[in-house]
């Protein structure tokens, strides 16, 4: 699963899919079947999106649960979140994740970030938007979903994974 991982590492997941298919004597599936998981937050402006991501449930879930979980154990998952292996684990902050791993911004920024992700990983067919319980601010969540549906996705129809 691509949850919270840097795009270059996620791209290697497709290599594992094709290698596994070959080892099983099967034809590799189409990239259009590949699903990529990303944390997404869209608002009218980049500033509003950053504020909503950091101070809303997205930031809270990573700050209080996922980031600590990914740092635990003998093989901390946090190492796959870094864009540079020489980074300290402590440098993988919520702000770092928002800038480098999450898809956060205005509709224009989110469109650009999703295009960049698509090209970095070599193409995919489905974006799975990881979401959390936004009951405390359902209006902002609904706005984010609406902007994604109405302002972002129509501009990405050419990205089919083929």
Model regions and ranges:
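Active-site-adjacent structural elements that line small-molecule/cofactor binding pockets in enzymes
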Residues: 1-162
